[in-house]
Amino acid sequence: LLTERNVEVAIARQPEDSIAVSDANVEAWLDEYKPDLICLCGYLRLVHMKPWMAGRVLNIHPSLLPKYGGKGMYGTRVHEAVKQNNEVETGCTVHFVDSEYDHGPHVLQKSCCVAHSDTIEGIAEKVFKLECEAYPEAIRQVVEQLRV
């Protein structure tokens, strides 16, 4: 959809056989092109935020932040904590990135109920469905604001 509208898209994927995409290479590319919007997906490291990046970097997190956020809280670890603490609601948060893990201003949150009978895998499935709705919606909202 973006390429059909002449919007340039670049994707830095982590090869399955490597530990990580080179942070230095990604950082150099970002500094060169200074994109209007950077969307993180599964990026489990702290982003070295530069002044030009403020309000341009989005992340999605599998909890209703500020609950279950911070260093080391991702994926199954979040869902395990939700189950262990007998939460009745969980969800996802799309937020702007700042210099702390899972801390920046929220763009939107989507929630779902957690039944006592839900497994960790079941919770993960519910949250993933919400993430698939929330991230595109949040990106649209942010892009509309960029156009103003």
Go through the PLM ranges and name each one.
Residues 1-148:
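One-carbon transfer enzymes
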